[in-house]
């Protein structure tokens, strides 16, 4: 699979966020190297695993689970007879603590068999060994006195001997006869032995062994004769202490080494669980759900939200391809959400293929694609010093080489960057060829020719991103079945362009363009009016007439989802007529209106 889509669709940003939610460094690397599920069955299995962990995360909260370093090498070293350091044993204890924490978390609530059972059953906690290591080793440099009876006894003797030495040295320091020979009234350590600082010129006045000289030569560090024997005793005790520490480390290392096969199996399971936990945490952040995976080349995203847009600002969209139509041509104003719709469709399908739940309604269905073929933006043309048009054509040439059954092709501003007539003709030809090759298609455009092509071609449907001409702001709502307008005249008039210029511009339009613009204006007007009343209305084929649907008698309510069906002639584009729907004033009931075009058995608009 071509992986360029990961950057273009911003899947890399989703993965980077998931990396931040991983606890272990190894899991972070696994997430960065994540590959899409190779088959539909694999995708379904991955999604059910993520969904199971997500449900437990919501129900039980986060497990007791901390970051650990890679320890399989440490265990293998112990298996071969190596002695582990205190720091390495603490890493082992932390890993064992993770095993215990995950096992306890999984068992907090009763549940039926889950697809993650094998992972959690693979965990083999060692609570006794974990506790012994944790209580015996205080830090990578310090072992607790209580690590063994022998160690406790040796350290007690060391402390007693040290106290005896300090008492004798304090007497020397306080003695008026000897303290005048000292540089400072302090006791220090040199070569593991307690000494006092003597002025160099009085070195013969304080009997004992010289162990060091200061850098200036003004001070010599003398071990007084009175403490030589006690210092030697301490050296002996410290050697015994180190031997006991080594014995304890050897014992722990042997126990760890004996666990190697089971430990490695548990460790691998822990990393996979950490990966799933990161995916589940991301799902909680995004309010995501598990979609179904279609057996056919078809997807249906309901109330889909782009995961990288602020949840307070993102507008959910409904996008479907592969059932009644295989190609969606999206039109509308710039910055109106056309490109976001493309990216949302591609990104959410791709996320599911990587085992992520998607920010869409749980009734959504995704498709398992072999390729995501994307031409969005001008990154490549900028890098290679190509014109915008040349950059697009270079990418589309590569797309044509790969497009086929079970591929999703997303084309932004198809045919842009060249002569409009040639660009539109080329865009239609590209769409037709990609359809012949069997790819599902979504394309954005400003060309009226593509809107007409979508109206006239079975399997191709218009969609538009709505624009509020009063506020001059896009609503970001995607309306499938209705082509969009550029709104150039309305926007220009709102911004102060004289009306005579607008009128002159209209006269320069061809008759066909005028008719299409009129149809689009009426459809858009109906749509905006209907949205305000929570009802959808479109044209009837009654020549020159107005269809009026009267509400039930006063005091009655409209049954929920009452459906009114209109059938319009195939020549709708040449004769758009108004419709009036009388909405009951006593409630907020919804009326569903279905519009059938020509002899089509399914509604074109609903």
Question: Which functions belong to the PLM regions below?
Answer:
Residues 58-66, 86-89, 246, 253-257, ...:
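Extended, Lys/Glu-rich alpha-helical coiled-coil stalks
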């Amino acid at each position: 699979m071509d992986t360029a889509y990961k950057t273009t669709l911003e899947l890399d940003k989703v993965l980077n966020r998931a990396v931040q939610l991983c606890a272990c460094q190894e899991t972070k690397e696994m997430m960065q190297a994540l590959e899409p599920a190779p088959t539909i069955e694999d995708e379904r299995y991955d999604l059910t695993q993520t969904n199971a962990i997500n449900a437990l995360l919501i129900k039980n909260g986060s497990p007791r689970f901390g970051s650990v370093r890679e320890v399989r090498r440490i265990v293998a070293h112990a298996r071969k007879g190596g002695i582990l350091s205190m720091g390495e044993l603490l890493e082992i204890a932390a890993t064992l603590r993770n095993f215990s924490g995950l096992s306890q978390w999984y068992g907090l609530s009763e549940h039926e068999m889950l697809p993650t059972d094998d992972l959690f059953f693979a965990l083999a906690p060692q609570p006794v060994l974990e506790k012994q290591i944790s209580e015996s080793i205080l830090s990578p440099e310090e072992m607790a006195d209580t690590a063994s009876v022998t160690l406790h006894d040796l350290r007690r003797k060391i402390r007693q001997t040290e106290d005896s030495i300090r008492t004798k040295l304090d007497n020397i320091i306080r003695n008026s006869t000897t303290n005048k020979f000292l540089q400072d009234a302090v006791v220090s350590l040199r070569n593991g032995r307690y000494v006092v600082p003597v002025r160099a010129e009085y070195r013969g006045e304080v009997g004992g062994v010289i162990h060091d000289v200061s850098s200036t030569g003004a001070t010599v560090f003398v071990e007084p004769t009175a403490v030589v024997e006690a210092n030697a005793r301490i050296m002996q005790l410290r050697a015994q202490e180190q031997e006991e520490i080594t014995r304890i480390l050897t014992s722990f290392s042997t126990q760890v080494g004996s666990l190697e096969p089971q430990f490695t199996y548990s460790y691998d399971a822990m990393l996979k669980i950490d990966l799933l936990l990161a995916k589940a945490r991301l799902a909680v952040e995004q309010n995501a759900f598990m979609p179904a995976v279609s057996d056919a080349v078809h997807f249906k995203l309901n109330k889909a939200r782009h995961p990288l847009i602020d949840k307070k600002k993102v507008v959910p969209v409904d996008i479907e391809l592969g059932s009644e139509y295989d190609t969606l041509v999206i039109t509308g104003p710039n910055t109106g959400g056309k490109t976001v719709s493309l990216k949302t469709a591609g990104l959410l399908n791709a996320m599911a293929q990587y085992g992520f739940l998607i920010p869409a309604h749980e009734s959504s269905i995704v498709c398992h694609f072999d390729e995501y073929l994307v031409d969005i933006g001008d990154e490549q043309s900028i890098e290679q010093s190509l014109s915008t048009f040349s950059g697009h054509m270079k990418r589309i040439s590569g797309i044509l080489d790969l497009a086929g059954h079970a591929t999703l092709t997303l084309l932004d501003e198809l045919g842009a960057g060249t002569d409009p007539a040639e660009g539109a003709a080329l865009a239609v030809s590209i769409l037709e060829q990609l359809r012949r090759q069997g790819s599902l298609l979504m394309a954005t455009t400003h060309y009226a020719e593509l809107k007409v092509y979508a109206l006239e071609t079975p399997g191709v449907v218009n969609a538009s991103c709505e624009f509020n001409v009063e506020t001059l702001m896009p609503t970001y709502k995607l309306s499938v079945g209705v082509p969009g307008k550029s709104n150039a005249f309305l926007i220009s008039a709102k911004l102060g362009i004289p009306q005579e210029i607008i009128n002159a511009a209209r006269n320069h339009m061809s008759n066909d363009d005028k008719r299409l613009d009129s149809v689009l204006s009426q459809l858009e007007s109906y749509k905006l009016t209907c949205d305000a009343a929570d009802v959808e209305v479109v044209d009837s084929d009654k020549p020159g007439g107005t269809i009026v649907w009267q509400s039930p008698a006063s005091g009655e309510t409209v049954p929920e989802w009452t459906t009114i069906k209109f059938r319009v002639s195939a020549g709708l584009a040449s004769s758009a007529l108004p419709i009036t729907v009388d909405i009951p004033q006593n409630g907020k009931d919804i009326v569903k209106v279905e519009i059938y075009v020509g002899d089509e058995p399914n509604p074109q608009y609903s």
